């Protein structure tokens, strides 16, 4: 065995004998250079096991870090889902129609019946009525006391309708008596000629019996159906139906009044209310308005037309009369087809309104089969509570329209059940209201509950920030600030109390004013009545009415109560202003107490100012809700990362900078010595081997075994560079430790160093890259927590975090959509598979593999 020794094999100037031995003794003698003897196979297995352990430890650290990150992400997503669910529930609840609303309404003390029928006024869109939409109606178990002279809604309805028609229509005396006789209308089948014959026993024509009535004062004779007239004492005297029942007797009106499309309501104002007895013991309905009434709807035998297709065709007939004088008014005949019509009184003869843009006609129709009606234009009619002589344009209505309504409109029985009551004072009354007649809830952006919650949350945040500043800066001033705050609260409460007292006085003044106005109206009515009775001759300035003057008629409220109310209102105004000024001064003093130029104080004041400016406009835009929620969400989810980054900056900046300078210094000197070591190694190798390449490569391979690394390792930076970075000692001593004493430590350090650094491990070392980097890498590291403020700053990080959150939310949505599509595809596949199996089963049953049917054989 020949031993060849040479020096200078290890860089750094230490001469280490390296021997070239045979394969047999290589294992025993290499122990002086290695902690234990191993070959290539054992080296690979040990490296693999060590790498597996390192990977396992790295995975554990990554899982812990990922778990910490996921915990905050899950908390943020939970808060997001919770807020979204809460907002959705509030939105749904605000738009949900409430079936019953239980509460208290202060409507007064004892409810007594009132005879002031003129307190009931017309409210609606019709000209002459008040435009008002705030109707309410409550159910209560309060018992009502009614006087004998209590006004009903029907009486006020008579008065209002009479006023409307008398002020809008032309007066007429057509309700006088007519001399009528019964006639028959006979027609031939071959022509449209109809003969009028005087008979005793009449027969129906066109579904009606006919009368020929003569109005001698105007030399007018009309041919009218018997259903429009009323006989008096079984004589030849007849009057139009409804003349003895209605107040207004007018001739012609504007067409729009006759349409039946003007809804009105008869309503009252406090202290008056309308009460309807429900027919149950101690159960009533109280409100400010009665039922809806439509002007122009016929009172008797109405017909409710429904459906789109309705058509009426005029039937032109020639009426032949032997002899007559003056005007002879003939009827207009129609044949109508109603696809869907209902008779309100279950009678075969009904009244229907047919109109165009510029004309209207009231038809009296008789049903001859299921959908066909024989109709005739009426001459007289009862519209609302006014008896009218209807306009009869002698032409066909081409584009017919039919008014649609229900049978309960203008029901006299219902109007008689509503009574007028009067009350005074303030007394709570338990009530319940249905949504369609009482309190109507409207949808808002996030609902009123969400707005209130947002205001409370914003105020709480501002107050918390302000109080946090006080606690952090000047603890000794907290008591003083609290005293000022308590003064502000007390002043605000006192101001609210004064405002409530002022409102009560104002309400009493309004009630008294309304009562005086109603008294003036009643006096005007009495005066008009006296003028009609006693002052017939208009030339007399003074006249006798026949009734003694009552001093109570001119008695108004001449007490000093009104002056007392005015003085109290002035005093309360002054007290309210004084209280509010005091509250403002206390609030200003509390702010001055901690008014310092400190940045935290300025932040608290600015936050309070911004939120105070936001509160009046919270309901104006939904964007503020979204921005506020995103800011809160980012604050909750990003606080740990921000604090961790600040801790790394403050604690690791010094050590990181020191390691960075050492690294640069040793890297520069190591490059010089590395060049010198390579030159020495080449000279020594040339002198010893004498050009023997095989021995050189064997020693190279043996050296690789001794180092425990592959060729890829030789291309990486030397391990002694990382040794110096790991232990912080001198170059010579650390190089000796890394190459001879602890060869594995340098390898592990190299694997876990900058070359294999994992950004997800959450290391506290702050790496400062001299070559810089792009914004994307910077912000990604900022989001992961490894590099935050020194690189890209908080605003850019905040914007990028918002983009990441939106992207993740969109990703969740797309993944959910993919799951839904996958489930649908599976369902379709299942359905197709079931259909396939059924078809296959039926096919196999119809076409079995073995046929048991024997066919006849012919020989």
Curated annotation (Swiss-Prot):
| Signal sequence extent | none
Q: Where is this site: Cleavage?
A: 444-445, 684-685
Question: Which residues are processed away as propeptide to yield the mature protein?
Answer: 1-6
Glycan-modified residues: 40, 112, 141, 148, 186, 214, 233, 244, 340, 368, 399, 406, 411, 422, 483, 490, 550, 557
Tell me the domain of life: Viruses
Residues passing through the membrane, by range:
615-635
One GO biological process term is: symbiont entry into host cell
Protein name in the entry: Envelope glycoprotein
Q: Which organism does this sequence originate in?
A: Equine infectious anemia virus (isolate P3.2-3) (EIAV)
């Amino acid at each position: 065995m020949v031993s060849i020794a040479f020096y200078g094999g290890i860089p750094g100037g230490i001469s280490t004998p390296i021997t070239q031995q045979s394969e047999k003794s290589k294992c025993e003698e290499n122990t002086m250079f290695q902690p234990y003897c191993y070959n290539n196979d054992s080296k690979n297995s040990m490296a693999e096991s060590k790498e597996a352990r390192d990977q396992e430890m790295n995975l554990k650290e990554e899982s812990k870090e990922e778990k910490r990150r996921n915990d905050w992400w899950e908390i943020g997503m939970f808060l997001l889902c919770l807020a979204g669910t809460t907002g959705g529930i509030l939105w749904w609840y605000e738009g949900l129609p409430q079936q019953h609303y239980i509460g208290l309404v202060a409507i007064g003390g004892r409810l007594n019946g009132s005879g002031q029928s003129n307190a009931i006024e017309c409210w609606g869109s019709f000209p002459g009525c008040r435009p008002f939409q705030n109707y309410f109606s409550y159910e209560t178990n309060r018992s009502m006391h009614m006087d004998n002279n209590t006004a009903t809604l029907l009486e006020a309805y008579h008065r209002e309708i009479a006023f409307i028609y008398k002020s809008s229509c032309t007066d007429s005396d057509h309700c006088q008596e007519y001399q009528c006789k019964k006639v028959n209308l006979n027609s031939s089948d071959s022509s449209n000629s109809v003969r009028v014959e005087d008979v005793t026993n009449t027969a129906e024509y066109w579904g009606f019996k006919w009368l020929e009535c003569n109005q001698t004062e105007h030399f007018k004779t009309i041919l009218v159906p018997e259903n429009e007239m009323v006989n008096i004492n079984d004589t030849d005297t007849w009057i139009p139906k409804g003349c003895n029942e209605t107040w207004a007797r007018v001739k012609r009106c504007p067409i729009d009044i006759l349409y039946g499309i003007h809804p009105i309501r008869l309503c009252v104002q406090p202290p008056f209310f309308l009460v309807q007895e429900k027919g149950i013991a101690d159960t009533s309905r109280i409100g400010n308005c009665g039922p809806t009434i439509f002007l122009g709807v016929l009172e008797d035998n109405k017909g409710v037309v429904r459906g789109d297709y309705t058509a009426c065709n005029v039937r032109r007939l020639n009426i032949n009369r032997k002899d007559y004088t003056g005007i002879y008014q003939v009827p207009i005949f129609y044949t109508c087809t109603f696809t869907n019509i209902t008779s309100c009184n279950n009678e075969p003869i009904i009244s229907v309104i047919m109109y165009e843009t510029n004309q209207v006609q009231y038809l009296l129709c008789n049903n001859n089969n299921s959908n066909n009606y024989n109709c005739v234009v009426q001459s007289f009619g009862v519209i609302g509570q006014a008896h009218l002589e209807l306009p009869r344009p002698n032409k066909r209505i081409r584009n017919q329209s039919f008014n649609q309504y229900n049978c309960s409109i203008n029901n006299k029985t219902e109007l008689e059940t509503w009574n007028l009551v009067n009350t005074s004072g303030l007394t709570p009354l338990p009530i319940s209201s249905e949504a369609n007649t009482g309190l109507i809830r409207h949808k808002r952006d996030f609902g009123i509950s969400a707005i209130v919650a947002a205001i409370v949350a914003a105020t709480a945040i501002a107050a918390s920030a302000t109080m946090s500043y006080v606690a952090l800066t000047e603890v000794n001033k907290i008591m003083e600030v609290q005293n000022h705050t308590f003064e502000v609260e007390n002043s605000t409460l006192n101001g609210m109390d004064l405002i409530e007292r002022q409102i009560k006085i104002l309400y009493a003044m309004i009630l008294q004013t309304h009562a005086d106005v109603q008294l003036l109206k009643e006096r005007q009515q009495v005066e008009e009545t006296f003028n009609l009775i006693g002052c017939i001759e208009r030339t007399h300035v003074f006249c006798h009415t026949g009734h003694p003057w009552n001093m109570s008629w001119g008695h108004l409220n001449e007490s000093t109560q009104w002056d007392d109310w005015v003085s109290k209102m002035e005093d309360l105004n002054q007290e309210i202003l004084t209280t509010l000024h005091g509250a403002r001064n206390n609030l200003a003093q509390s702010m001055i107490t901690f008014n310092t130029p400190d940045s935290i104080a300025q932040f608290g004041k600015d936050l309070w100012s911004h939120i105070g400016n936001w509160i009046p406009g919270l309901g104006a835009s939904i964007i503020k809700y979204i921005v506020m929620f995103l800011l809160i969400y980012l604050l909750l989810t990003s606080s740990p990362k921000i604090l961790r980054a600040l801790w790394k900056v403050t604690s690791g900046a010094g050590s990181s900078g020191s390691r960075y300078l050492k690294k640069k210094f040793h890297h520069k000197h190591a490059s010089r010595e590395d060049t010198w070591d390579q030159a020495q190694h080449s000279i020594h190798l040339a002198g010893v081997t004498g050009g023997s390449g095989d021995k050189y490569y064997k020693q190279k391979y043996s050296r690789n075994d001794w180092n425990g690394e592959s060729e890829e390792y030789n291309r990486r930076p030397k391990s002694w560079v990382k040794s110096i970075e790991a232990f912080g000692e001198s170059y010579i001593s650390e190089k000796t430790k890394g190459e001879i004493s602890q060869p594995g430590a340098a390898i592990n350090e190299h694997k876990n160093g900058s070359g294999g650094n994992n950004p997800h491990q959450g290391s506290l070392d702050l790496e400062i890259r001299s070559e810089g980097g792009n914004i994307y890498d910077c912000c990604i590291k900022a989001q992961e927590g490894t590099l935050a403020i020194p690189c890209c700053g908080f605003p850019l990080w905040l914007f990028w975090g918002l983009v990441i959150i939106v992207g993740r939310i969109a990703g969740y949505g797309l993944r959910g959509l993919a799951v839904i599509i996958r489930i649908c595809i599976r369902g379709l596949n299942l359905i197709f598979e079931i259909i396939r199996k059924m078809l296959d089963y039926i096919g196999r049953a119809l076409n079995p593999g073995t046929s048991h049917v024997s066919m006849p054989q012919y020989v």
